[in-house]
């Protein structure tokens, strides 16, 4: 199996399966001199770990990270950083009934057809369990980006199933299990999930992520565009079926006069581009939104086939998230951090000495600033 590495200069290679002894990753390319301890990583892992509320899987994993290499006396050395998270609460017997069958909507069928072998225990390599190591690696990237550039990466749930979640305040995000930016809607979300869990079904979600403080110039103009790499990274997250940058698909209904982000000496007047123009960061907030499909493993009867191609009825009795989107916010934040970290190093290597006479304008102009009207053609 190939395709387990993300990045060009800041490279992260993950390994491990849902019910194996451990999962982990190797980070290659982290600059030396970054102060780093397990505690710096653990805080992010705790935001993602399972069993934290009744609305997520009840698999109890402490997700305690071990730093095996690349750090000496609390400082990165520039050598590969190996991170390990041991699995402690596997319950493989729950999956015996799907060993010979394929769950609809899951990776079971294509995995079997591609490799001729499949670890059916918890989905094996296709399980969202693997995202824990992405969060661990992302914590390293976030720390460097924060200390070096003051970049802040934050995410929140924008929609749970049919329920949109109006943004009110970042302060509310950390105070509820949904990462919802609106405290008033949390009881409604809880009631919805309680009924969903009783029904045995699952539901999707929409997650928004914002990176503030990203300098102008990161990204390449053709194949390695910053927005292309962000979309690639987000689409690699389990269950993600769509990604938007900035206005995204709403751009279809906009006019050019509405979509184009005008510039003034005081700053940009809007951010429909989501902080990326021509594949290169503009200095505005990088805005990303992703759609997550409903969990494929559900307790309801579904039609499928077995290995011989015979029709069967499948239902799954393991411990699963009825909505994987509930724990996806830290994962999305981590993936954005990894992409930004990689492009930061690439930009520094190629264009770190470039200077222009044009001043960098503010990400958003102060309220009330208007663009100078275009001169009328005679």
From Swiss-Prot:
Keywords: Amino-acid biosynthesis, Aromatic amino acid biosynthesis, FAD, Flavoprotein, FMN, Lyase, NADP
Gene Ontology molecular-function annotations: chorismate synthase activity; FMN binding
Reactions this protein catalyses: 5-O-(1-carboxyvinyl)-3-phosphoshikimate = chorismate + phosphate
Cofactor dependency: FMNH2
Its EC number(s): 4.2.3.5
PROSITE patterns the record matches: CHORISMATE_SYNTHASE_1, CHORISMATE_SYNTHASE_2, CHORISMATE_SYNTHASE_3
Cofactor: how bound: Reduced FMN (FMNH(2)).
Keyword Endoplasmic reticulum: no
Listed HAMAP family: Chorismate_synth (MF_00300)
Family membership: Belongs to the chorismate synthase family.
Protein name from the UniProt record: Chorismate synthase
The organism of origin for this protein: Azoarcus sp. (strain BH72)
Lineage per the UniProt record: Bacteria, Pseudomonadati, Pseudomonadota, Betaproteobacteria, Rhodocyclales
Protein's gene: aroC
